[in-house]
Amino acid sequence: MTLRRYILAVLLLAPCAWLTLSAQEGNDEVGVWSELGIEKAITRNWDVGLDLEYRAQNKARFSVGLGTSYKVNKYLKFGLSYSFLYSEKNKYKVKDEVIAGSDDWTTGYNLIDEWYPRHRFNAEATGSVKLWNWLKVSLRERYQLTHRRAWSATKLMHREDHIKQVDFDEDWNEISWYETYVSDNTELKEYPTYTDQVLRSRLKLEYDKKRCPFSPYVSAEFHNSVSKGDHMLLQKIRTAAGCSYKFRKRNEVSLSYLITFDMYDIEEDELVRQTVRLHDRLHAINLGYKYSF
């Protein structure tokens, strides 16, 4: 094996192995994402496209987007896009409370399961360079603005109250047991209008050899919100490893494996975790197809 192929194997296989092993640990969520794209070349350097995406996971999402990009030269490309997002608000919170001063306790959960729309605008610049005539290194900086109008959702509150009961038998011996009382209530939860601005920085390493239809790659992306306070706030970190395959000139299919560390929930305005932990991550298998003409 040549040095070039050895480096490529390390870059691509090591992250894949780590992602696969890490998915087996912790309370991780697993989803399947699918993408369908159509791209039309207006000129040699300018193209427009339409994208459809569906994410099957705990918080499912459907989106449709329109975009355009312009390649200034072989090192620099600019892009603009708009996406309509229709997302599921699936929030499940376990309630487990002990009543102070007694042996009684309450268990249950709060559940919100609704769908809501959002609008997203992107502006990006991508710089790339090719090393050793086969390794393409690119850095993409994307400004992302997401707007959501005020909406409301019904919250289901299920409770099971475990109450200690005490009695005496015919010999005046104390007998105790627990009785469970079940109740279900609903509450209308209001979500205000919000606009989130995020700077997304993605570094990507890709095998890009002329006349080779396969393009394996690895990438890492950082999402930093600029909507909270006077400094950037790290929302999430997303890593990916995958491969695309081009056939019949106009067709391209892709398969990738992504892992996302959520750090801050901007919609709920709450900290998910203070550090990048090896638990409670989102894993996704991404399947894609694009037709270019």
PLM feature spans:
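Predominantly the C-terminal beta-signal and adjacent terminal strand-loop region
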Residues: V218, D230, L234-F293
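Residues on the lipid-exposed face of transmembrane beta-strands in outer-membrane beta-barrel proteins
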Residues: L36-K40, L66-Y70, L80, A123-G127, ...
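Solvent-exposed loop/turn segments connecting transmembrane beta-strands
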Residues: Q24-V32, L52-S63, V226-L234, R277-R281
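Outer-membrane beta-barrel biogenesis signature
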Residues: L19-R44
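Bacterial Sec-dependent N-terminal signal peptides
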Residues: M1-G26, F293
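Repeated loop/turn-to-beta-strand initiation elements of outer-membrane beta-barrel proteins
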Residues: R44-L50, Y75-L80, N133-V137, R211-S215, ...
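Outer-membrane beta-barrel translocator/channel fold
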Residues: A60-R61, K77-S176, Y181-D184, Y194, ...
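Hydrophobic, lipid-facing positions within transmembrane beta-strands of outer-membrane proteins
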Residues: V30-L36, W46-V48, F62-L66, H119-A123, ...
